[in-house]
Design a protein with these regions (language model features):
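Linear, non-domain "peripheral" regions
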Residues: 1-37
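A broad, low-specificity signal marking well-ordered, structured residues that form hydrophobic/aromatic
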Residues: 15-17, 60, 122, 133
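Secondary-structure boundary elements
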Residues: 24-87
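Short, exposed beta-strand "edge-strand" segments with a Pro/Gly-rich flavor and a Y/T-containing core
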Residues: 41-47, 76-77, 81, 146-163
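A short, highly charged nucleic-acid-interacting micro-segment common to nuclease
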Residues: 84-97
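Hydrophobic/aromatic-rich core segments of domains that either
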Residues: 96-162
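Leloir-type glycosyltransferase catalytic cores
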Residues: 155-179
Length: 179
């Protein structure tokens, strides 16, 4: 749904603002139901934040399959895999969907985070114990049929991310100064 707003600044100029909602109200309700249920069932108040993040990390990658069709054809409409809805409701995701889903959980858990991106990829940046860490569920989710949780990209420093040098995690450090 698109909402158009026009504001008259003077007799000569008008500025038009278009706001595109990423989710319908029904989708937001469904996402919140899943997030609230997972937090209620798997997270306790006395858990350290890192443990909470690991539980959510594993939940998402255990319940999501990487959407190869969307990766190969950006116009594929089979799943909404580039959104948290695709990840949490449909069970299919691409990097944007994984990052959005994780950000929603982190926000609900009051853990400071950003999504960090470049032309090719998007992942999460998480503030924990006074430092910033990278968190990439897309690259931690094994594409094979084997259900093995990886944590190569679980709360790693920028230095470690640069050591991995996979070519997809380059970012502008003048924009993401926290990293």
């Amino acid at each position: 749904r698109t909402i158009d707003c026009l504001k008259l600044l003077s007799q000569k100029y008008k500025i038009g603002i278009t706001i595109n909602k990423a989710y319908t109200n029904e989708e937001i309700n469904q996402i919140n139901e899943v997030v609230d249920k997972v937090i209620k069932e798997k997270i306790t108040n006395n858990m350290p934040p890192k443990e909470k993040i690991k539980i959510i990390h594993n939940y998402i990658i255990d319940n999501t399959q990487y959407d190869k069709l969307k990766y190969e054809d950006k116009n594929d409409k089979t799943y909404k895999s580039n959104t948290a809805y695709g990840v949490l409701i449909e069970g299919y995701g691409t990097c944007n969907g994984y990052a959005d889903a994780m950000a929603i959980f982190l926000d609900k858990l009051n853990i400071i985070n950003y999504k960090i991106s470049n032309e090719k990829h998007i992942w999460n940046l998480v503030y924990l114990d006074g430092s910033w860490y990278h968190l990439d569920l897309t690259w931690d989710d094994p594409i094979s049929d084997i259900n093995i949780n990886r944590d190569i990209y679980f709360l790693i420093t920028t230095e470690k991310l640069e050591e991995l040098n996979d070519g997809t995690h380059n970012f502008d450090k003048t924009i993401y100064t926290e990293a």
